[in-house]
Swiss-Prot record:
Gene Ontology molecular function, alphabetical: ATP binding; triphosphoribosyl-dephospho-CoA synthase activity
Enzyme nomenclature, EC number: 2.4.2.52
UniProt similarity note: Belongs to the CitG/MdcB family.
GO biological process: prosthetic group biosynthetic process
EC category name: transferase
Listed PANTHER family: 2-(5''-TRIPHOSPHORIBOSYL)-3'-DEPHOSPHOCOENZYME-A SYNTHASE (PTHR30201:SF2), TRIPHOSPHORIBOSYL-DEPHOSPHO-COA SYNTHASE (PTHR30201)
HAMAP family to which the protein is assigned, alphabetical: CitG (MF_00397)
Keywords: ATP-binding, Nucleotide-binding, Transferase
Reactions performed catalytically: 3'-dephospho-CoA + ATP = 2'-(5''-triphospho-alpha-D-ribosyl)-3'-dephospho-CoA + adenine
The name this protein goes by in its record: Probable 2-(5''-triphosphoribosyl)-3'-dephosphocoenzyme-A synthase
């Protein structure tokens, strides 16, 4: 019974990744229509990556459930070790292409926290149908003590390094904390912005329109390390401003799709891809499935 419930939730995480890549059109991003601003990956690359990561999603939630009483830092270390193995498996499946590195990190923490939370709330194990937005908030809050050390430990001593990872370079150059920062704050962009917005949208619109509007909203607010890495601060600010204007127009679904298709070509021409917004889109979908919004 327990394993079946945990398996079903891990499959929601996989489903969230599938929904994210399948949503189309997504400016600058890989979707069903084209590869966006990416010349090294395609829709099929993402499928390969998801299949590789799927067993680890199961392992993350089972680890959280099994070690729910453990100190948060110890649970984090277990999840990180699993996450590193997952990352290696992903890179093997994609022939070295980074499709989901940041999202895998976030999913490891949130699935681990989901498992730990379920171990403490046995009524949900027998009736996931009563999962609420309060449960979502509680799960995200569990991540905070697990990752409170992360910025100092991972990014606090970079002055001694000669070579940086992509995320480290963003922190050194711009002070962007990326997924580490989001996690260490308890995923507040998710709980305070993305999910409330999506709950409102889905109550007023069909699922596809709601998902597209959510993407635009996220592109208008997210501190997107991928955009900044590719185009700098001004390019990122420009995308945010463009998306704010698009939101204000309150377009029909047909016109919104046309606008996003046009903007896709604009970002392709600038080699810009809002990968940070895409990751938060997938995380929003995960909790939307748990809350039965989708």
């Amino acid at each position: 019974m327990t394993k079946a419930v945990l398996t079903s939730i891990s499959q929601l995480a996989l489903k969230a990744l599938l929904y994210e890549v399948s949503l189309s059109p997504k400016p600058g991003l890989v979707d069903r229509f084209d590869n966006g601003a990416h010349d090294d990956m395609s829709f099929m690359t993402f499928i390969d990556s998801m299949i590789a990561l799927s067993p680890f999603f199961q392992a993350y939630i089972e680890t959280g459930f099994a070690y729910a009483k453990e100190e948060p830092l110890l649970l984090f270390n277990r999840l990180r070790q699993l996450g590193q193995k997952a990352e290696e498996t992903m890179f093997c499946a994609t022939q070295g292409i980074n499709t989901h590195k940041g999202l895998n990190f976030s999913m490891a923490l949130l699935l681990g926290a989901t498992g730990a939370y379920l171990a403490r709330t046995p009524h949900l194990m027998t009736d996931l149908g009563c999962f609420s937005k309060e449960d979502t908030l509680a799960i995200c809050r569990l991540v905070k003590p697990m990752t409170a050390h992360l910025i100092q430990t991972d990014l606090g001593h970079l002055n001694t390094k000669k070579e940086f990872t992509y995320g480290e370079q963003l922190f050194v150059t711009y002070g962007i904390k990326g997924p580490r920062g989001e996690a260490s704050e308890g995923f507040t962009t998710l709980t305070d912005h993305a999910l409330p917005y999506f709950r409102q949208m889905i109550s007023q619109n069909d699922p596809e329109t709601s998902q597209l509007r959510l993407l635009v909203y996220l592109m208008s607010i997210v501190e997107d390390g991928n955009l900044i890495h590719r185009g700098g601060i001004e390019a990122w600010k420009g995308v945010k401003a463009d998306m704010r204007l698009l939101l204000q127009q309150d377009l029909s679904t047909t016109d919104l799709r046309l606008a996003l298709s046009s903007y896709n070509q604009c970002l392709i021409n600038q080699h810009l891809s809002p990968g940070g917004a895409a990751d938060l889109l997938a995380l929003t979908f995960y909790f939307a499935f748990l809350e039965k919004l989708l």
